[in-house]
Amino acid sequence: TLYNFLKSYKAKVETEVIGMAGSIASVLAMAASPGKLSIARNGFVVIHRAWGGAIGNSDDLRAAANMIDKYTDQICDIYAQRTGKSVEEIKGLIANGDYWMTGVEAQAQGFADKVFND
């Protein structure tokens, strides 16, 4: 995945959230090197459970739902590694849908290292 590529990149990876890092963009932002994830004070990070869709018979739909649950587990693990929170804490944040954080809130919860005003 692109996240894995960025995490394994030998040079420092710096991410800067100028507007919003929502959905998979929030996962990519987590690939920043330690101390290198910054967000605008008026920026947002939005996290949620994985989404998907499927067509087919009931077995196909169950398989798709299981895969979406696995994606959610992987995403929550990435957030947990970055923030120092447990996977269960992350799942609690997203249990009721989208979880929005301002730049200041994202930093306070470990989803960003620095807040900037520009």
Which residues are covered by each model-predicted region?
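N-terminal organellar transit peptides
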Residues: 1-26, 30-118
